[in-house]
Swiss-Prot record:
Keywords: Decarboxylase, Lyase, Magnesium, Metal-binding, Polyamine biosynthesis, Pyridoxal phosphate, Spermidine biosynthesis. PANTHER family: ARGININE DECARBOXYLASE, BIOSYNTHETIC ARGININE DECARBOXYLASE. Pathway: Amine and polyamine biosynthesis; agmatine biosynthesis; agmatine from L-arginine: step 1/1. GO terms for molecular function: arginine decarboxylase activity; metal ion binding. It is an enzyme of class 4 (lyase). The gene is speA. The keyword Magnesium applies. This is Biosynthetic arginine decarboxylase. The lineage of its organism: Bacteria, Pseudomonadati, Pseudomonadota, Gammaproteobacteria, Alteromonadales.
């Protein structure tokens, strides 16, 4: 590509749109991060950052966190709602509640809470969906507004802990997910002498579209029907505790791509709110739950990996709908709460790792088949000669399909013993020559060619063996076909010469990234610069800050990666604030109840039995180092 430029690279990887300005490509072809939007000229080259960490003894793969991105995401969302409240003259405020299930890492939660440390009245609270999460937020919520929202299924202990939170000075909303929870709350609150703050999760009829749409609608796992909500109101009236009902909650599902779905869901929920107010409930908080999407592919569309709205439009629609419906019912406007964890955390983390090797198809010259060869091979040779000397553009697709059909027949004949191994190898190489030639002759401007182009890009793609576990670091890519931006961290000033797929180092054929951001769409292969072992480049997996760490599993006993917290100082200097070591081999063995100490005893017995005395110390040291070592590959040069 003679017309390749840095702008072409930026457009090709669509960095401008999915990165929200946090990541970019420099004029030198290096991927950069600008974690502090107040100082956009303060950039860090990710390639150099990774090399510096490796020199300091931090082995790849490493998950790099940028806390300044978390700060910006918190404050930009709060600002969007503040502006919408002012625009529509809304008579209440906004509170951002972070659901820690999205990323429970101490650094992440603390940085989110610290993002508004300078505010006189912080607009932050925390959400818990289990007893362990509740124990965590009880110890951390005082750093913000002390508002805690308790979701999820509950037992008596969960409820007691939530009520104890009130005694500790927190404002704890216990959201009823099912009818039986009310009886437990009433009993435990009486026993502890604590008046509860109650919330209801309404089960809306409306269901948003997306991968998590089952979270909403009449068949959703959580929430109360209209009849059950009325039962709660009646029981609270009987116990003279209707004033304890202070919050209405609903959830349309994570990653709602279409703003119309959000508007419609809020509209239905707002009528629940107003009807409950008319029944005498003292509800003053309207919790819209999650759903605020992240544009993983940068297409700004209604796809499952994107969103067709921005922050201002999101806030404006919620505030506008609530304003209109509250005015219609002549009811007071409630405090708006959202639980937007994915939006806050996705961009702040990037996984950086190395390519340990590549495998490319080798297209070789072929000679005509021997005269006595099966007719099938002569047919394949004829297809190749017609293609290499052809003048008829319309024959391209026909020749390609004939070659594919002939290859399948050759493989079948080999399985029946009617074709030799050498003849099968010739057939495969002839097909590869045809595919390679056709790939260079097809045009993306011809819509009949596009499916074949996609097919050939996938068939002829290089394999990049990358030092990571898909199941540990990008589990959603495997489990729900989530798209994450992937790109080389350097060399992007040169035109991509190859297309590649990224394979992890697990012993599992599912350990492959099979979707890539490519321009304004998704492809099954990634355009990459030429790669060589003498001058390798690193790979970056972006927007992995939401859910991936806590959902990651230890397939093949690959554990947590090393991680680092990095920021930019006011003077533009890079500050590696902290480094957390990933799991060692001994750590992951312990997770599955295997004891490294016992193993060492066994190793010693085996060494004494089978190794000559002068080698025993060295062998035992190697085994001990192996147990203490990183679970990922370190020595493959």
């Amino acid at each position: 590509m003679n017309d390749w430029s840095i702008d072409a690279a930026r457009a090709g990887y669509n960095v401008t749109h999915w990165s929200q300005g946090f990541y970019g490509i420099s004029d030198q072809g290096e991927v950069t991060v600008s974690p502090d939007p107040k100082n956009p000229d303060h950039k860090i080259g990710l390639n150099e950052l990774a090399k510096d960490m490796v020199k300091a003894g931090v082995a790849l793969p490493v998950l790099v966190r940028f806390p300044q991105i978390l700060h910006h995401r918190v404050n930009s969302l709060c600002q969007a709602f503040d502006q919408a409240i002012q625009k529509y003259e809304y008579q209440a405020d906004y509170l951002l509640v972070y659901p820690i299930k999205v990323n429970q890492q101490k650094t992440v939660v603390e940085e989110i809470l610290a993002s508004q440390a300078s505010k006189e009245v912080p607009q932050l609270g925390l959400e818990a969906g289990s007893k362990p999460e509740l124990m965590a937020v009880l110890a951390m919520a005082q750093k913000a507004s002390s508002v805690i929202v308790c979701n999820g299924y509950k037992d008596n202990e969960y409820i007691r802990l939530a009520l104890i939170g009130e005694k500790l000075g927190h404002k704890v909303y216990i959201v009823l997910e099912k009818l039986s929870e009310l009886k437990m709350v009433l009993a435990e609150s009486k026993r502890l002498g604590v008046k509860p703050r109650l919330g209801l999760r309404a089960r809306l009829a409306f269901q948003g579209k997306g991968k998590w749409q089952a979270s909403g609608g009449e068949k959703s796992k959580f929430g109360l029907s209209a009849a059950q909500i009325l039962t709660v109101v009646d029981q609270l009236k009987e116990n003279d505790m209707l004033d304890s009902l202070q919050l209405l909650h609903f959830h349309l599902g994570s990653q709602i791509a279409n703003i119309r779905d959000i508007r419609q869901g809020v509209s239905e929920a707002a009528r629940f709110y107003c009807e409950l107010r008319e029944l005498g409930a003292s509800i003053n908080c309207f919790d819209v739950g999650g759903g605020l999407a992240v544009d993983y592919d940068g297409t700004r569309s209604q796809s499952n990996n994107s969103m067709n709205y921005g922050l201002s439009e999101y806030a404006n629609n919620i505030v506008n709908v609530l304003t209109d419906i509250c005015n219609e019912y002549e009811q007071p406007m409630p405090r708006i709460i959202s639980e937007s964890g994915r939006h806050l955390t996705a961009h702040h983390a990037v996984l950086i790792t190395d390519v340990i090797g590549t495998e490319a198809y080798q297209v070789e010259d072929i000679q005509p088949p021997a005269e006595e060869s099966p007719q099938l091979l002569h047919n394949m040779w004829q297809s190749w000669t017609e293609l290499s000397g052809r003048a008829d553009q319309r024959a391209l697709i026909e020749i390609y399909h004939d070659s594919q059909s002939d290859l399948q027949e050759a493989q079948s004949l080999f399985a029946l013993g009617q074709l030799s191994l050498a003849e099968r190898a010739w057939a495969e190489q002839a097909n590869l020559r045809v595919c390679h030639e056709v790939q260079g002759l097809l045009s993306t401007k011809n819509r009949y060619h596009r499916p074949i182009i996609d097919e050939l890009n996938e068939k002829l793609a290089d394999k990049f063996f990358v030092n990571f576990s898909l199941f540990q670091s990008l589990p959603d890519a495997w489990g729900i076909d989530q798209v994450f931006p992937v790109l080389p961290l350097s060399g992007l000033d040169k035109a991509p010469e190859r297309r590649a797929v990224m394979l992890d180092i697990t012993c599992d054929s599912d350990g492959i990234v099979d979707q890539y951001v490519d321009g304004q769409g998704i492809e099954t292969t990634l355009p990459v610069p030429a790669w060589s072992a003498e001058s390798p480049y690193l790979m970056g997996f972006f927007m992995v800050g939401a859910y991936q760490e806590i959902l990651g599993d230890m397939h093949n006993l690959f554990g947590d990666t090393n991680s680092a917290v990095v920021s930019i100082e006011e003077n533009g200097m890079t500050n590696i604030e902290s480094v957390l070591a990933g799991d060692t081999v001994a750590d992951v063995l312990r997770y599955v109840n295997l004891d490294a100490v016992d193993f060492m005893r066994t190793y010693e017995e085996l060494v004494n039995q089978h190794i000559v005395e002068e080698e025993r110390a060295q062998i035992l040291e190697e085994l001990q180092v192996g147990l203490k070592g990183y679970t990922y590959l370190e020595d493959f040069s």
